[in-house]
Amino acid sequence: MDLFGKKVLVIGMGKSGISSARFLKKHGAYVVAFDEKREDEMKTQQKETIRKFADELYFNDLPDAVVDTSDMVVISPGVPLTKRYITLAHKRGIEVIGEIELAYRFCRSKNIVAITGTNGKTTTTTLVGEILKKVFDNVIVCGNIGFPFIDYVESSTDDTIFVIEISSFQLETIKYFKPMVGCILNITPDHLNRHMNMDNYIRAKMRIFENIDQEGYSVLNMDNSITRDLIGCAKGTVITFSKNESDTQNSVFVDGDFIYRNFLGKVEKVMRKDDIFMPGEHNLENTLAAIGCVLPFEIQPSIIEKTLKEFKGVEHRIEFVREINGVRFYNDSKGTNTDASSKALNSFEVPIILIAGGYDKGESFEKFAKLISQKVKKVFLLGQTKQKIADQLQKIGYLNFEFVEDLKEAVKKSFEIAKEGDVVLLSPACASWDMFESYEQRGRLFKQYVNEL
């Protein structure tokens, strides 16, 4: 693919947008950058970085003429395909792709493990990377995890193994992207404000299998009703994982106290499930998925076992922060939907003080409210969805909730009522964009406020 002299419009100036602009400029493209923010809303340092790589820069509104004269459009994951300028580009026959697709077209290595799903993506992606790094020298973990794929393609070789976390938004804009291993961890309602309905969301996730050939592998969760039904759409060799016993070839499963793998007709014991360092049933699921993703690499069970005994999880996912007077504080800012936060609540058998609420993605809180009533002694609600969650709690007669203005107030009040043995858990069940730049910022502020107590 020759970019020299091509006019490429890059839409969205977050991490992947800036990385795409940098790459395109280096390869001789004429780069036009656009972000919907007003110029005064963008940080000075960010603007200065963009100007290094952009020949033209637009804020807030994009003239149709700019789209009309572009040879290609590269969009960031946060940009909906329904935007006027995207629709116009399609109408004009201009190719619209994302950073993942752009990176793939310049990637020399075909050793790509791509992982998607509603929940568990970051933990599983990181874990797969840790297992592979025990055996292979050149393993790169990137993607939606916070490190754009495009930043690493030029330094890669034929032997590089990429482990890429991919969101449904990123999968919407692939065309030729073909992983060696594609995995869907689970699918539950999420991002319905963007995808409009579950069918569209499922179709976006399924695209991870779209270009896999006979030499590739599709990894699926048999314990999730939606992903189980996708087995007929999976391509290449299908690998399944389940917390239940299985006699299926090419599978990872639990039998009694042990995790087993069945690959190429050979059944092997991997480890005791209770030896996994990370707590919670959801992390058992993430572990099984990770073992499934590395099956094609034929790694010794002892190496996998050692990694899983040592792996402590990822930041913002049921992350232990501090214990004060017998009260433990956990940061689960990555709980951005009710399924993820439900799993966090179910990870504890002690009284929980919950901090929840945030940006409204259109999800129902009915089931989540019932679980709160069973597991939570008090919940502090904040953000755009606080009234929506409160309404569901009131419907079932649960009144132990309180509205707070911000996260600092929530932490302070939680500590004031907590008793020895309690857990204070930030698990919002919502995205962060109403009050914070990202779930990472929300989680780090939570940790800051806890450490200031």
From Swiss-Prot:
- What the protein does? Cell wall formation. Catalyzes the addition of glutamate to the nucleotide precursor UDP-N-acetylmuramoyl-L-alanine (UMA).
Q: What protein family does this chain belong to?
A: Belongs to the MurCDEF family.
Q: Give a GO biological-process term.
A: regulation of cell shape
Q: Name one GO molecular function term.
A: UDP-N-acetylmuramoylalanine-D-glutamate ligase activity
| UniProt-listed Enzyme Commission number(s) | 6.3.2.9
Return the protein name: UDP-N-acetylmuramoylalanine--D-glutamate ligase
Q: Which organism is it from?
A: Caldicellulosiruptor saccharolyticus (strain ATCC 43494 / DSM 8903 / Tp8T 6331)
Positions that bind ATP: G117, T118, N119, G120, K121, T122, T123
Using the UniProt record, give the first listed, main subcellular location.
cytoplasm
Catalysed reaction(s) here are: UDP-N-acetyl-alpha-D-muramoyl-L-alanine + D-glutamate + ATP = UDP-N-acetyl-alpha-D-muramoyl-L-alanyl-D-glutamate + ADP + phosphate + H(+)
